[in-house]
Curated annotation (Swiss-Prot):
Part of the 30S ribosomal subunit. Contacts protein S5. The interaction surface between S4 and S5 is involved in control of translational fidelity. One of its GO terms (biological process) is translation. It comes from Methanoregula boonei (strain DSM 21154 / JCM 14090 / 6A8). This is Small ribosomal subunit protein uS4. Keywords: Ribonucleoprotein, Ribosomal protein, RNA-binding, rRNA-binding. Disulfide bonds: none annotated.
């Protein structure tokens, strides 16, 4: 057992460190989502790996058919958890959990949602706004770019109350304003 006050590693490094296609894909994700390093991609992969493992265990439980009510309860619990997190749609099934890819996880990060909502010009600027305390969720300042935003919190993302960006005439904010539909999903 380890020391309980110390954080453990929340990601798993690749088994083959010099695999060209993987490196190119990770580099593309780092650039597209404005990540600091590939460790953030690996964290997202590990997070999804846990969900997929739970889904595979549920499928194994279903095939054994020992207790159908236990299977249904665990299935609905997993699906509803992932729907609240915003990773799955309303009519999702276990197959949708197994089909999830890393970009789905990276789209739920605060940094990405700040950029998608048009509060920043680029993913890198979105990261900077978050770390400098200019972004709030539901009125509470959040300074973690990797914070996973739930569906309920998604609509409450805005500039923090004491941030100079609250003023619409702020010089940087006028540069951020884009035409409708440009880069926003």
């Amino acid at each position: 057992m380890g020391y309980p006050g110390k954080n453990h590693k929340s990601y798993q490094t690749p088994k083959r460190p010099f695999e060209k296609t993987r490196i190119e894909e990770e580099t593309r994700l780092v650039i597209e989502y404005g990540l600091r390093n590939k460790r953030e991609v690996w964290k997202a992969q590990s997070h999804l790996r846990k969900y997929r493992k739970a889904a595979r265990e549920l499928l194994a439980l279903m095939s054994s058919a020992t207790n159908q009510t236990v299977f249904e309860a665990k299935k609905s619990e997993l699906i509803s958890h992932m729907q609240r997190a915003g990773l799955l749609g309303p009519d999702a099934d276990i197959d949708n959990v197994l089909a999830l890819k890393v970009p789905a996880q990276l789209e739920r990060r605060l940094q990405t949602l700040v950029y998608r909502k048009g509060l920043a010009r680029s993913p890198k600027q979105a990261r900077q706004l978050v770390t400098h305390g200019h972004i709030a969720i539901g009125g509470r300042r959040v300074t973690v770019p990797g914070y996973l935003v739930t569906r309920g919190e998604e609509t409450t993302i805005s500039y923090a109350g004491k941030s100079p960006f609250v003023d619409a005439s702020h010089a940087e904010r006028t540069r951020i304003t884009r035409p409708t539909g440009a880069g926003v999903n």
